[in-house]
Amino acid sequence: MEIKGRFDHFNFNVLGFEKSIRVYEKALGLKEVRRKTASDGSFILVYMGDGETSFTLELTWLRDRKEPYDLGEGEYHLCLRVPGDYDKVRAFHKEMGCVCYENTDMGLYFICDPDGYWIEILPL
């Protein structure tokens, strides 16, 4: 049996989903493509997409969660390739104050979202 799957989405749990949405819109150009709210208001799922692929980033907000999430020591991250002038994009992210790691020898950097998740930025 050959399974021909494709990636659909990746999830980040967030404390302040409106703030997170604004960061993903401004820093990465993602747009909200879908939202699901529990009938009892206990959670909200917001799916952010790039408009080019069907892959989405699912932001999950849990009403009763008050303390920051423990992201552990796992070195997992998302990576986004950006078109255009890479140096200009990096300067924009530095101006936003969201660059959390930079390795100029390797030609890459990471930004952090409001909950501490890392997103690698590479040229297209």
Q: Could you say what each language-model-derived stretch is?
A:
Residues 11-54:
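Core segments of cupin and vicinal oxygen chelate
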Residues 15-18, 71-118, 123-124:
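Vicinal oxygen chelate
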Residues 6, 44, 53-55, 74-76, ...:
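Residues that flank catalytic or metal-binding motifs in active/ligand-binding sites
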Residues 52-57, 116-120:
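Short, charged/polar, Gly/Pro-enriched secondary-structure boundary elements
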